[in-house]
Amino acid sequence: MGACFDLAGRTAVVVGGTTGIGRALALGLADAGADVVATGRRKAMVDEVAALIESKGRRTARIATDVGDTASLNALRDECVSSLGAVDIVVAAAGITKRVASVEMTDLEWDQIIETNLTGMMRTYRAFAPGMIARGQGRLIGIGSLASFVGLMEVAAYTASKSAVAGLTRALAIEWAPHGITVNAIAPGVFETDLNREILKGPRGQEFLMRTPMRRFGRTEELVGAAVYLASDAASFVTGQLLVVDGGLLASAVNV
């Protein structure tokens, strides 16, 4: 059974892979045997994660990328293929949020969140899908959220973007299934990262904590199993799904 989850001989690209959830997934895929390129906008952080991947005995490439730029993503694809060969697994993990009352949100704030969380994901997939279609196989994995299922207070743009991630995942899954490509997403509950650590220390964090049946926040490494599963042969017939990893929060059916 262990062989079903072995990623040896495969190449993964994690866009948004230098911080938070993306970083944990990049390192986890490397632990599972894959060669991994973890990319982001800041070259110093790209180099830092690349060194950790290399320390695990895996191959990598050090490439800074901007999900807001199609040319940058196409260049990432070309350099990955040139350095490591065909890309088997792509994780679209770039994401941002901002808590603000909807009537006070600026057009720029709205556009930045939709651009990164939704359009950036589509750009990422669009860069790598043609190669996967040509080979007749591939794994695309996005990052959803509890906001893919329910509304969250004062994060309207984030909620809209993550709801759209769910729709995009399903649409691309049925479009690309005939080409041997699976398209899925992981929907984390409340996980402590640099992005939300200060918020979780306050009253809002305590509310989430009390509404999570396991009575704790998730650790980013607890998302690795979901990513390895979706990237592996074990999930060869799984597509169009959002895999929830949330300590039971969504199942508790309370207003979050």
Q: Where are each of the predicted segments found?
A:
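Short C-terminal tail/terminal secondary-structure segment
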Residues: G2-A3, V150, V228, T239-V256
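Active-site helix of classical SDR
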Residues: Y125, S161, T169
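Short, small/polar-rich loop/turn modules that mediate ligand/substrate recognition or access, typified
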Residues: A177, T182, V238-G240
